[in-house]
Design a protein with these regions (language model features):
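N-terminal catalytic cores of NTP/NDP-binding nucleotidyl/phosphoryl-transfer enzymes
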Residues: 8-71
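Phosphate/ribose-recognition catalytic cores of enzymes acting on nucleotide-derived substrates
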Residues: 200-313
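Glycine-rich, Lys/Arg-enriched anion-binding loops that position phosphate/diphosphate groups
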Residues: 141-247
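N-terminal Rossmann-like or analogous alpha/beta NTP/dinucleotide-binding catalytic cores
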Residues: 56-143
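Residue-level signal for inorganic ion chemistry
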Residues: 26, 79, 117, 183, ...
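Short acidic-hydrophobic, aromatic-tinged amphipathic segments that line or gate anion-handling sites
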Residues: 2-8, 67, 88
Length: 313
């Protein structure tokens, strides 16, 4: 996949494209992109995704501070795995926000050589999102751009005949509840946090459960709700099982800051300042306050047994 930014020389060939923010690049997004690639193959054109580095609503609403499933770099990496030919990263500015749908489509056609546009079944664009699919088709005829409506993605949970709508907002809600396993079903992969290992209070080592503390690389990244999780840890190019705690360590009273700290099984290397990825498998319990350190240690041993079983370790 080739990535073109706002200031890039757009050397792409004519393409079939779709537009969206694509936070999380979940199953629904990938189904839409599959349709783009299929139409492109039928017409002998390239396939493109048009997206934005910053959430459009953040530009239009100064007090909106979204917590996102993926950073911009993570999103690009996931898009590259879809097989799409081009990713066109447009800066969503107030000027772009004021464009009508027709004006925006004109830019896509003339600057980015987009010959056909596949519109998500529930997607709207243009100033105030006031126009709909029939309007896009009409403008497309005027501009010489084919406009197609994508099929909706229908996802059925295991052992259920009920279809659910997969959306980034629904996945965010699941993660904020700690339901990381169901979020993974919608995403099609385990939700993850990337960051750097930083220094902590060293209490974990004193009680027999040394931890690596993660500083997340992007402040806009969503962090699941407080609690204990079974996770997979990728560090120094290898994967390990881990027992993760997110929260404020109420038993230890180490200060007001929220911590993300993981005890990595069968691991004892110094990884301070190293990059690390945590992939969430299951939340096992909420954060609890214990009456003594001894009670905390006993619970950590029970957590270890349960999480090793979940991870088949």
């Amino acid at each position: 996949m080739q990535l073109f930014c706002e200031t890039s020389d757009i050397g792409s060939r004519p393409s079939v494209a779709t537009i969206g923010f694509f936070d999380g690049v979940h199953r629904g997004h990938r189904y839409l992109i599959e349709q783009v690639c299929a139409v492109a193959a039928e017409r002998g054109l390239a396939s493109s995704v048009v997206t934005f580095p910053v959430h459009p609503r953040k530009v239009m609403q100064a007090d909106y501070h979204p917590k996102l499933l993926t950073t911009c770099d993570e999103k690009v990496s996931l898009l590259a795995k879809t097989g799409v030919d081009y990713c066109m990263m447009l800066d969503f500015t107030p000027e772009i926000a004021r464009l009508s749908a027709r004006e925006f489509m004109f830019i896509l056609k003339e600057r980015y050589q987009i010959q056909a546009l596949v519109v998500g079944y529930d997607h709207r664009f243009g100033h105030n999102r006031s126009e709909g699919f029939e309007d896009y088709v009409h403008y497309g005829r005027e501009l010489g751009m084919e406009v197609l409506l994508a099929r909706a993605y229908a996802y059925s949970k295991e052992a259920s005949v009920t279809e659910v709508t997969v959306s980034s907002s629904a996945i965010r809600g699941l993660l904020q509840e700690g339901n990381v396993s169901e979020a993974a079903e919608y995403l099609g992969y385990d939700f993850f946090l990337d960051g750097t290992v930083v220094g902590g209070y060293q209490v974990g080592r004193k009680i027999g459960f040394p931890t690596a503390n993660l500083r997340v690389s992007d402040s806009d990244k969503l962090i699941p709700c407080d609690g204990v999780y079974a996770v997979r840890v990728c560090v120094e190019g290898k994967e390990y099982g881990g027992m993760l705690s997110i929260g404020y360590r109420p038993t230890l009273e180490n200060g007001p800051d929220r911590s993300i700290e993981v005890h990595i099984f069968r691991f004892d290397a110094d990884i301070y300042q190293q990059p690390m990825r945590l992939s969430f498998v299951r939340r096992t319990r909420p954060e609890l306050k214990f009456d003594s350190i001894e009670e905390l240690i006993a619970q950590l041993h029970r957590d270890e047994v349960e999480i090793k079983s979940i991870l088949s370790l």
